[in-house]
Structure formats: C-alpha cells, structure tokens
C-alpha cells in the first residue's frame, strides 16, 4: 500500500514532522535556523493567547518539546495595566474641587481628620453633580440579581446602586463632621434624609437550632416594643423566615425582602438611635449564641411574662428551697441531701440558716452567747433589752415616738430575764432555786395588802406583817377575811356590824353580856376547858343543863361520858359539847305581850 509511504493518514494532508507551532513564514526550508532556548516561565499563557499572531519567535524544528520559545525584543510590547495610583486627570471630581492633596504643613491628628472629612465630602458632592458615580470597569464589584418593581422596571440598576452608596456615605460623613468640626455647614445641595435605615443580619445559618425571631419579638411583641422604646428607632424583621408559612402577605415591603437573608431593618431619623438599636439587637443575638438555652435569663423572663399574660404563672417560682436555700426548685425536688444549717434558728433575729454569732441583726460589740442579762429570752419577744427581732425593735421605737415617752416599755415575759427579775434585782443571772429570799410578804399575806394599807374599819393601817398561816389562824379571823373578801367581791360595805361583833371590831363580850353603867360587875361564869381537838384560842361550847355544868346542890353528879350504848359520831358529838359553856341569856328588854285569852270573842252589838 503506497499511501503508507506517503506520510499521510486518511484525509489529513498535514505531514508528520517536527515543525513547531510558532514558525515564521519567511523561514528557510533547509531547517538551518538559529534558536535561543529560554525558561518556560518567560512567556505566560496569556501572553501567548494575546500575541499569537503578532510576535515573531525564533524557533527551530529541533527544539525540545515542552519548552516555550522566547519572544524577540523587536516585537510589540503589552500595554501596562492601570493601577490604583492613576493619573490625576482621570479623576474628574478632583480637578473640579481645587483642593490640594499633598499636605506639607504640620497638622495635628484632629486637624488632619477634619481636613480629610471635608475633602471627601467635597469629592462626593462633585461626583454627584457631574453624574460620575459609576467607577471604572476594573473597580466594579459583581452585579447583584436584578430586581423589578410592580411596573416591571428594574430598580437596582448600576447607576442607582452607586449613587445611593455615595449618598449614604456623604450623609454619615456630614453627621460626623457636624460633631467634630466647629461651625461646620454642609453643602448647599445637601438634604438631610428623613429616615436612616440600616440592616442587621441574623446568623440563622450558623445557629439553626436557636429561635432568634422568638427572642427578638418576645411574648406578644413586648421585647421588640421595649427595644424600640429604649432606642427610639423603628425595628422590623425582614427576609427569609420572617413570615410564617401559610400566611399570604400583600405588603410590598415583605414581598421584596423575602429573597434576602433574615435581618432586622432599623429605621430612625438620627444615627445615634440607629446605633443604640443595633447594640440592643447584637446583645440579644450574642447572648443567645453564647449561653445555653436553659441558662438564658432573657428567655426565662420571656416565659415568665408569657405565663403571666396567659394566667398560668405560679408565684412560688422565686421562693427559696427550705433545704438548701437556693432559688429554682422546691424542697421535695432538692438535689442535695438534708441540710442541717437550714434547721438552725438564730436566737437574735429568729430566722433560719445562721447562728447567733453570725447574725447580721446583732448589735456591734454585744455578746452572742446565752449568758447576758437577757439570756433565756426567745427571739421575737417584746422587751426593753437589745435582743429580739429588728422589726420588733423598730416597732417599739415607733411606739415610743408616738407616745412621747423616752422610757422603753417593760418586758412582758417571765423568767430570769423578766421585769421583776431583771438585772436591777441583782439575781438576774441566777437560777430560781439558787436565789435567796426577797424579803417580801408571803403570797397569802399579799391578798389583803391593799386593805391593810388603806386601813380597816376598826383602826389605822397596819401594813403587811408576819402572822400565822391560814391554817394556824382561828375561825373568827378566817371568817373575818372571808366576810371582807365577800363584801369586796359583791360591792358590800365592810363597815357594818354583824351579829355578835361590836362596831369597834374588837374581841370584847357582846352587848347583852356587858353590865349596865354603875352596876357592880357580876362574877364570871366558869367555863369548861376546850375539847382536846380544838384550835388554839377557840372557846368551848356550852353544854345543855345537867351535862357540862356543876349539878345543883343535893343532886348526884352525872355519869362521865356519854350514855352506854352510844358510839360513833354521836358519841363524838356529845363529847364535843359536854364541857362547853351555856348559851348566853336573852337581852334585857320588855316582856313580850301575853298570849291571847281562850275566851270566845264577844257577840256583835244588837245581837
């Protein structure tokens, strides 16, 4: 087959050989060419693509494959790329300002900053005037996706975006210059915007498990309203996820922002309000992202507020545990074991959880031990000493001020620290059984103390004095005490005379036993001695005639004792009245009238 020897394959008429790609047209056919090998990095790929047809390379068929030829020096040079430090003539606004940019004078940092602000404001103003807002092609950023309004017109064109960017920058610079430069006046064509808007994006993609919208809005929107009140700016949540699924919103503001990421739109009339609102929003976002959900105090307060609005709030959530004293759980849910410290009761203030020496209500310098004059007192009692609860002491002080008296009220409790046994008694620290006699009257003598001091009906006051005990006094004295006590109880008069007692109250005989004036005194009637079991001072009772007295002359004496056959109580009764004196005779007075006659009454007259 002759076609194999021709060096062609099929329809390809290009002969196989070592001919290089960049061969000149005027090269010699004998293959004797001069080549200059060079490094592969001397000519880049971009240079080859741009200068493929123009430059002339000195190549040879025998050059090794993989080696890039070197561009000859007589070829055309590539145009140098423009850098950021271009010619001054390229900046049209700089030529119109007429302000120097090369500063050779000595200026402070404040002056330099003020001049920079003024220069940049003038530059932006000139660019807006001549409509030079779009930068060069090399300085432009990638264009965003186009957006259209309701009429189908594009709203985010290149000119609109750059003009708005320059206007926002000039507005911020003018606000800053008015604060730093004294007597600064903005440009004549500057119109202060009625509202300043700024967006704060929410990191929902970084923390998908956190409900940022719920934390920002709060229960019934109260958290968002509170931030608006504190900052003075209007805050709105826009972007993806701001509207719940299934709710169709016809608002153009919501529909136009659904393609953006979730963000907070802040609108205010001043920059300070916007910055304050941004700070509040960042605080909520950083707290939710850095603190676990169970320890987030903002969420706890929001849940508590929501429960209060729904009427399901339990008011015992802030109560301390009775076992450990911590807040957040009850005693039956306490994770700790039994705490003995919580069961200790302070004797100074009466509260639990600390001892008396650690009590904050204890007076400075006062002893915390139970050995003072007011020892033994329980906490909370009203007293004149320094102990007790602080509330009780304040109440005592208030009552003293209202009453106008400077003396502290007396203590009302009994015991070693009571009023009668206080430090003034001298035995306040001793036990009751260790104290000596007080020198006061016995309890049964203090019963009629007031009567003795006021004076009885029969003499001057005698005062409390030592006397026999109630069981050692005779019956007359006890009857006297009972009568006086009864009269005083029932409003009676103690000055009246009872039967058998004179007005003088003395122990003399009865009036009918006294002889008339001027008559000789009658001999005393001998009385029998009292029976053996009688009290001292009690006279014996008289016996009937023929039993206790001496028999008349001529009669034999009666038999001693009771008649035979009598025993028991009757015998004792007879023995009691055997030797008693006879009863007194009746008083000397006129004889009673004679009894009526037994004759029948006379007939009536005229019978």
From Swiss-Prot:
Q: Which UniProt keywords apply?
A: Metal-binding, mRNA processing, mRNA splicing, Nucleus, Repeat, RNA-binding, Spliceosome, Zinc, Zinc-finger
Q: Which segments show compositional bias classed as Gly residues? A: 373-389, 534-545
Q: List the disulfide bonds.
A: none
One Gene Ontology biological process: mRNA cis splicing, via spliceosome
A Pfam short name: KH-I_KHDC4-BBP
Tagged with keyword Nucleotide-binding = no
* GO MF annotation terms: mRNA binding; zinc ion binding
Subcellular location(s): the record lists: Nucleus
Composition bias, kind Pro residues: at what positions? 550-563, 581-607
Q: Where are the membrane-spanning stretches?
A: none
| Residue ranges of domain KH in the record | 201-281
Basic and acidic residues bias spans: 46-76, 472-500
Q: Where is this region: Disordered?
A: 1-92, 134-155, 363-390, 407-607
Q: Which InterPro entries match?
A: BBP-like (IPR045071), KH_1_KHDC4/BBP-like (IPR055256), KH_dom (IPR004087), KH_dom_type_1_sf (IPR036612), SF1-HH (IPR032570), SF1-HH_sf (IPR047086), Znf_CCHC (IPR001878), Znf_CCHC_sf (IPR036875)
Q: What does this protein do?
A: Necessary for the splicing of pre-mRNA. Has a role in the recognition of the branch site (5'-UACUAAC-3'), the pyrimidine tract and the 3'-splice site at the 3'-end of introns.
The UniProt family comment states: Belongs to the BBP/SF1 family.
This chain belongs to which protein, by name? Branchpoint-bridging protein
């Amino acid at each position: 087959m002759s076609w194999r020897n021709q060096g062609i394959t099929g329809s390809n008429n290009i002969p196989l050989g070592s001919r290089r790609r960049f061969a000149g047209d005027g090269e010699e056919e004998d293959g004797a060419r001069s080549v200059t090998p060079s490094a592969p990095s001397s000519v880049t790929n971009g240079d080859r693509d741009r200068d493929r047809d123009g430059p002339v390379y000195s190549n040879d068929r025998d050059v090794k494959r993989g080696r890039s030829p070197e561009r000859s020096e007589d070829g055309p040079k590539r145009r140098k790329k423009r850098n950021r430090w271009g010619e001054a003539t390229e900046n049209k606004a700089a030529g119109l300002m007429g302000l120097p940019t090369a500063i050779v004078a000595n200026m402070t940092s404040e002056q330099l900053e003020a001049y920079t602000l003024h220069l940049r404001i003038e530059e932006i103003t000139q660019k807006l005037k001549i409509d030079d807002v779009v930068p060069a092609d090399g300085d432009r950023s990638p264009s965003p996706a186009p957006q259209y309004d309701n009429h189908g017109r594009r709203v985010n064109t290149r000119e609109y975006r750059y003009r708005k960017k320059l206007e926002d920058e000039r507005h911020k610079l003018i606000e800053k210059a008015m604060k730093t430069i004294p007597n600064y006046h903005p440009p004549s064509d500057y119109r202060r915007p009625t509202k300043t808007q700024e967006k704060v994006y929410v990191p929902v993609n970084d923390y998908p498990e956190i409900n940022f919208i719920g934390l920002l809005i709060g229960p019934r929107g109260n958290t968002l309203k509170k931030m608006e009140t504190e900052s003075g700016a209007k805050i709105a949540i826009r972007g993806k996820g701001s509207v719940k699924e299934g709710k169709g919103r016809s608002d153009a503001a919501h529909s136009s922002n659904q393609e953006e990421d979730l963000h907070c739109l802040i609108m205010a009339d001043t920059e300070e309000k916007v910055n304050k609102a941004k700070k509040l929003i960042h605080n909520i976002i950083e707290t939710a992202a850095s603190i676990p959900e169970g320890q987030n105090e903002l969420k706890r307060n929001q849940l508590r507020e929501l429960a209060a609005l729904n009427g399901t709030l339990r008011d015992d959530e802030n109560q301390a545990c009775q076992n450990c004293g911590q807040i957040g759980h009850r005693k039956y849910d306490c994770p700790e074991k039994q705490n003995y410290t919580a069961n200790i009761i302070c004797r100074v203030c009466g509260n639990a959880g600390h001892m008396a020496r650690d009590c904050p209500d204890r007076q400075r310098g006062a002893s915390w031990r139970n050995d003072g004059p007011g020892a033994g007192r329980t906490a909370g009692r009203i007293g004149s000493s320094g102990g007790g609860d602080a509330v009780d002491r304040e109440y005592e002080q208030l009552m003293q001020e209202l009453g106008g008296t400077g003396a502290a009220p007396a203590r009302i409790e009994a015991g070693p620290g009571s009023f009668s046994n206080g430090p003034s008694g001298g035995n306040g620290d001793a036990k009751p059984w260790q104290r000596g006699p007080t020198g006061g009257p016995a309890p049964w003598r203090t019963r009629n103390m007031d009567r003795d001091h006021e004076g009885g009906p029969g003499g001057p006051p005698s005062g409390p004095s030592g006397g026999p005990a109630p069981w050692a006094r005779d019956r007359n004295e006890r009857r006297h005490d009972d009568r006086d006590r009864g009269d005083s109880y029932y409003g009676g008069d103690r000055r009246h005379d009872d039967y058998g007692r004179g007005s003088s109250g003395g122990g003399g005989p009865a009036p009918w036993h006294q002889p008339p004036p001027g008559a000789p005194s009658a001999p005393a009637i001998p009385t029998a001695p009292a029976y053996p079991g009688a009290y001292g001072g009690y006279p014996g009772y008289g016996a009937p005639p023929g039993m206790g007295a001496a028999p008349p002359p001529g009669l034999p004496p009666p038999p001693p004792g009771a008649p035979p056959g009598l025993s028991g109580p009757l015998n004792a009764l007879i023995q009691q009245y055997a030797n008693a004196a006879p009863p007194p005779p009746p008083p000397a007075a006129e004889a009673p009238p004679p009894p009526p006659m037994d004759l029948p009454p006379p007939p009536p007259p005229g019978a």
